[in-house]
């Protein structure tokens, strides 16, 4: 991460009635999504997180939802990698065993992987992946 260079969470376009349901990691995810959309990346978010009703959880599992799949999967191939798998974390959260399994498996299949607790690092690393030279990268020591 570049010293002295900080990104704020990007503005969200959500209705006020949904604001109470948006936590810190949700803000991180929405900011990352906003950035990736502005970048024009081919990507998606796997909706694995969050609390769900038991019936909905059973339905999703039956439909093939897998625990531990990284938060963000970027399908654009760059720098010899098949794609970029990114796990977003907040606070003192650490990767689960399932998340570590997926990241290691994707890495063995030629994917670049990242676990990050910072929007700054996320943006910096994604820009690096795409070969984008920015002010933040020129400040890296």
Label each region the model flagged.
Residues 1-141:
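Catalytic phosphate/metal-binding cores of nucleic-acid and nucleotide-processing enzymes, i.e., regions
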């Amino acid at each position: 991460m570049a010293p002295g260079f900080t990104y704020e969470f990007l503005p969200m376009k959500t209705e006020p009635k949904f604001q109470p349901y948006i936590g810190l990691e949700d803000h991180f995810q929405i900011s990352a999504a906003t950035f990736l959309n502005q970048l024009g990346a081919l990507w998606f978010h796997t909706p694995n997180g969050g609390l769900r009703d038991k019936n909905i959880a059973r339905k999703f599992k039956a439909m093939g939802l897998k625990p531990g799949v990284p938060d963000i999967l970027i399908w654009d191939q760059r720098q010899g990698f098949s794609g970029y798998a990114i796990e977003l974390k907040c606070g003192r959260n650490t990767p689960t065993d399932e998340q570590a399994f997926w990241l290691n498996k994707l890495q063995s299949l030629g994917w670049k992987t990242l676990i990050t607790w910072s929007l700054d690092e996320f943006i910096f690393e994604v820009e690096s992946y795409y070969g984008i030279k920015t002010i933040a990268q020129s400040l890296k020591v």
